[in-house]
Amino acid sequence: MKVLLINGSPHKEGNTFIALSEVAKALEKESIQVEMIHIGSKAVQGCIACYKCFELGKCIFQDDLYNKIRESLTNTDGIIIGTPVYYAGPNGSLCAILDRIFYSCSHLLQYKPAASVAVCRRGGASAAFDRLNKYFTISNMPVVSSQYWNSVHGLSPGEALKDAEGLQIMRTLGRNMAWVLKNLKSNTELIPMPEERQSTNFIR
């Protein structure tokens, strides 16, 4: 079994990396493979609502980051997304790539356990955490929890190492993800068959 970790920070080895690495160590102790993808610091193309992904089965913008994540999703069993907190929300570049991934790759995501992690200096983590969870809860994905909301605190690179409670929350998240994955693996025949999708709006 394998879990994809997405580091949504522009800083490759900053506090978001520290938080996700703590989750990764807990997963590996449970014999779960991990892969971490860093979104980097380059500009990320957002969704333009062209709906070409409905025809192509993938986003019309074929950049390296999108292709790398999409390819990884074909052989992962779970996903954990980490972000720094900007104005009580996730990194905008992370949301740009997630909008495209979740809209064009829903068939690669449904029924895979997922979790989000927010890293902040002081406040805004819960709002960013909730925002990321919206991707999962609209995609038929079980959301894995921990002993507290999944946040770690730190400003300068490395400060997250001082957040003993935050790091414990990350380890608990890793163990809980492993537990969910193992239970799903032994009960794959119980995964529900979705109904045909209905789409309505509020205009009469």
Positions of predicted regions on the chain:
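N-terminal beta1-alpha1 ligand-phosphate binding loop
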Residues: K2-E30
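Generic secondary-structure signature for well-ordered alpha-helical cores
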Residues: K25-I32, G78, F102-S106, T137-M141, ...
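A short beta-strand-loop structural module common to alpha/beta enzyme folds
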Residues: Q33-K42
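Cysteine-cluster motifs in flexible loop/terminal segments that predominantly coordinate metals
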Residues: K42-L73, S199-R204
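Helix-loop-strand module that forms the ligand-binding subsite of alpha/beta enzymes
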Residues: I60-Y148
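Glycine-rich phosphate/pyrophosphate-binding loop and the adjoining helix
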Residues: P142-R204
